Amino acid sequence: MSEAGTPEGPIKKKRPPVKEEDLKGARGTLAKNQDIKSKTYQVMRDYEQAGSAAPSVFSRNRTGTETVFEKPKEGPAKSVFG
């Protein structure tokens, strides 16, 4: 049972205000000395070092070797509705 002056449950504390200069300093040091371990970033960096643009998933220039499951089919795609 609680007494008249004490609230029940956890006490919520207010966050201290954040200064703008603290944010500017933090943004600069987020990934300063860390290598990015993303496979996408690694591929992009390799293509950049080779002097060419990385292939885009939105590009229509396909060679047919992008997937190991099936080769591209000749002709338009067939409809599943008839």
Swiss-Prot record:
Compartments reported by the entry: Nucleus; Cytoplasm; Secreted, Extracellular space
Source organism superkingdom: Eukaryota
Cellular component, GO, one term: nucleoplasm
Main location group: nucleus
Record PTM Phosphothreonine, positions in chain: T6
InterPro entries for the chain: MUSTN1
Record keywords: Chondrogenesis, Cytoplasm, Myogenesis, Nucleus, Phosphoprotein, Secreted
Tissues expressing this chain: Expressed in vascular smooth muscle cells (at protein level). In the embryo, expressed in areas of active chondrogenesis including limb buds, branchial arches and tail bud. Also expressed in the embryo in somites, in the perichondrium of developing ribs and intercostal muscles, and in various dorsal skeletal muscles of the back including the neck trapezius muscles. Expressed in adult skeletal muscle. Transiently increased expression in the gastrocnemius muscle 1 day after hindlimb muscle reloading following 10 days of muscle unloading.
A Pfam family that the UniProt record links to this protein: Mustang
Record bears the keyword Coiled coil: no
Knocked-out gene: effects: In one study, knockout mice show no effect on glucose tolerance or muscle function with altered extracellular matrix composition. In another study, conditional knockdown in skeletal muscle results in increased glucose tolerance in 2-month old male mice with increased expression of Slc2a1/Glut1, Slc2a10/Glut10 and Mup1 and decreased expression of Ostn. This effect is no longer seen at 4 months and females do not show any difference.
Protein family: Belongs to the MUSTN1 family.
Protein name: Musculoskeletal embryonic nuclear protein 1
